[in-house]
């Protein structure tokens, strides 16, 4: 229904600026020195899932806008910027991390709502198929389901679905 071109960059920003030290501790506890880079990335997402799960919905009032490189959908605004709102003295890193995930999910809801306004001839689906790296986390899937108020179904091999689609387009193009 749309794309948020910086959702993975938002998570990368969290990793680099909010959680790098904690992720190192987590990897020492659960990781292995021989893990591949891909496995380390999965472990990083496991860490993020672990720390945001106990934070209540709404991130204790913290709101994040996920536009680290402008906004492209549903409205184009190259000057839009990512921001945190409602930061108070009692807000910790985990609330900020969950707010990033919620901000991404609320943006997905915004795109879906705009798409549904444009396509009135189709019945509103009660199910949304989720792909990409975020679909690997149960907590992230539940946050998306709660925000969309729909069932979320994770596609098979969600982190690779873009490459599969590109390969299918190439195959069709080549005959």
For each predicted feature, which ranges?
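Cytochrome P450 heme-binding "Cys pocket" and the immediately downstream C-terminal segment
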Residues: 172-175
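Activation-segment/catalytic-loop signature of the eukaryotic protein kinase fold
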Residues: 51-164
């Amino acid at each position: 229904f749309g794309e948020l071109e910086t959702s993975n960059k938002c998570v990368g920003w969290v990793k680099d600026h909010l959680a790098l030290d904690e992720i190192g501790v987590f990897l020492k506890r659960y990781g292995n020195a021989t893990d591949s880079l891909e496995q380390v990335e999965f472990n990083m997402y496991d860490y993020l899932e672990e720390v945001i799960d106990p934070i209540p919905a709404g991130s204790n009032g913290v709101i994040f806008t996920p536009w680290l490189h402008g906004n492209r959908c549903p409205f184009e605004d190259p000057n839009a910027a990512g921001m945190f709102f409602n930061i108070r003295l009692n807000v910790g890193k985990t609330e900020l991390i969950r707010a990033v995930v919620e901000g991404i999910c609320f943006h997905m809801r915004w795109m879906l709502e705009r798409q549904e306004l444009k396509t009135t001839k189709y019945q509103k689906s009660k199910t949304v198929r989720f792909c990409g790296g975020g679909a690997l986390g149960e907590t992230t899937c539940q946050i998306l389901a709660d925000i969309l108020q729909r069932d979320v179904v994770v596609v098979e091999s969600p982190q690779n679905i873009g490459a599969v689609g590109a390969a299918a387009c190439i195959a069709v193009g080549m005959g």
